[in-house]
Amino acid sequence: MNNYDVIIIGAGPGGIFGAYELIEKNPDCKIAVFEAGHELAKRKCPIDGKKIKSCISCKSCSIMSGFGGAGAFSDGKYNITNDFGGTLYEHIGKQPAIDLMEYVDEINMKYGGEGTKLYSTAGTKLKKVCMQNKLKLLDASVRHLGTDINYVVLENMYAHLKDKVDFYFDTPVESVEVLYDENTAGVDACSLQEAHTDNVSGYAVKTADSTYESRYCIISVGRSGSKWMEKVCNDLDIPTKSNRVDIGVRVELPALIFSHLTDELYESKIVYRTQLFEDNVRTFCMNPHGIVVNENTNGIVTVNGHSYEGADKQTENTNFALLVAKHFSEPFKDSNGYGESIARLSNMLGGGVIVQRFGDLVRGRRSNEKRIEEGLVTPTLSATPGDLSLVLPKRIMDGIIEMIYALDKIAPGTANDDTLLYGVEVKFYNMEVELNDKLESKYKGLYIIGDGSGVTHSLSHASASGVYVAREIEAER
């Protein structure tokens, strides 16, 4: 039997910052971190654009799992705001949430992010321009590390932690069991589970090879761990509620078209309300001079975007997502399944990601290689030319088209025929777990943080939740 003070499941942003803060507060704290994916240096996607051009569904996706989580190869944007990125503030308060995100920013600067720019919407005239065109610019400060610097920060944090924390890579956790004090012998399990009780003595974490015990357990499995998280909640009778799924496309166009926005703000979170259905369509994950990439979630290939801080890796294009949030009511509960079914349809029709010119979309015709090659925008991702209207539901497709025309008013050229749309992009959200103001479940000492909790949806919020829970644990100990 292996015993620890704290076991952390998942080495994404929440798990990393949780471990970091625990060690900062108490260097003698005995911590184990279990991660289903590889250590950072071994995270290599086999797609090279030559021999392997599309996803081969590796057992452990190096893009989505491993040290650093799904954010390891992202463009490293840390948005310091309560306006988007999660609802952490609903649990801990608005100012405490901002304070924690600013603390995370300080740590990132300490471990390799120094010199990167902090952008802000404060005082920008672009907010008025958006309002004049039925668009809303959300407030935020944005620290852009870039995919390259983000990786360096993770390397340095791992170097700091590896001798202080026991990391178990390529070690999926099979189950989490609640342990009770000996004085509860004879009390039936149902009675024990009815209350958030002091009778809990710790947790047993089981892998394929062994069992590990700890007084405290932090679960931080990210979005890719959504199905596993749902199973744990079902097994332990932890209440959850249905969340949402965001569905849309990734837009790629010449960087010059959005340069007046990206030069000042880097990333602008812009929201538009459609006229017919009053759905909210928003920009997401803007990557100036970036590239479009594949993403694998549960064996389904979707699209994403990256950008780099180093000038030698930058392109002439900017890309961003346009997403429509779909919230579901009873009796439907499987919002992620809905998103997966749409992504699977894209995979079936195109063998992966589909790309289409905006001009072809509005004319009701599929794109072909010839028209894309002759266009003004050179694709940064090898994708199958096709027709996205055969994949996306009409309501979502109409909303995206409306949004593109709205953006064209503040960034003329957005609605050019040669603007490229890649599909589909899906942002999956975990079922939101019922947690108290300590981010603690109904079981004392069992914390659920990061995107796996359904509470956070961003690097900054997930990282902040890890710091917060670490401080709660140390305050109690």
Labelled PLM ranges:
Residues G66-T116:
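Dinucleotide-binding Rossmann-like beta1-alpha1 core, especially the glycine-rich loop
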